[in-house]
């Protein structure tokens, strides 16, 4: 299954996940998140997709399990400051992360993510740029130890 954590904020691009599910009816899509996601799907004319499961709010433990066992974690955000959920998915053992092809996501995830070109891809998980590097490399790049070292360097220079 493909897994996404969604809400109704426009920048999270929840409709892309639904269009992806419609384009790939043989795959399951699990969507966790608060708000009336199913109602929004109805408003978009995508309510009756048999391969979509709306999980509602899930606990941290449930989210970690879903991330660890998914085929890919989907993060088709329109804009984002950093985008922590895909990094969390990698830390939980997600096999692949698919993120929007935006400058921020490229800077954060580099070669470790698959990329969704939102300008040309209306919703197809198979039409993505595959990752060129092991996503586990992200855990080294953004470890607590590295973050602490960077902070210490900044404090020493201040």
Locations of the language-model features?
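Carbohydrate transferase catalytic cores enriched for Leloir-type hexosyltransferases
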Residues: 1-158
């Amino acid at each position: 299954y493909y897994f996404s954590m969604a809400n109704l904020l426009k920048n999270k691009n929840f409709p892309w996940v639904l269009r992806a599910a419609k384009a790939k009816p043989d795959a399951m899509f699990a969507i966790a998140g608060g708000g009336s996601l199913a109602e929004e799907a109805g408003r978009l004319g995508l309510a009756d997709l048999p391969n979509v499961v709306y999980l509602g709010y899930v606990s941290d433990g449930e989210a970690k399990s879903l991330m660890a066992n998914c085929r890919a974690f989907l993060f088709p955000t329109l804009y984002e400051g950093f985008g922590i959920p895909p990094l969390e998915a990698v830390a939980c053992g997600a096999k692949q992360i698919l993120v929007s092809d935006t400058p921020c996501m490229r800077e954060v995830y580099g070669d470790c993510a698959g990329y969704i070109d939102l300008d040309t891809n209306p919703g197809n998980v198979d039409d993505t740029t595959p990752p060129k590097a092991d996503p586990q490399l992200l855990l080294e790049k953004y470890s607590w130890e590295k973050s602490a070292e960077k902070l210490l360097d900044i404090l020493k220079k201040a």
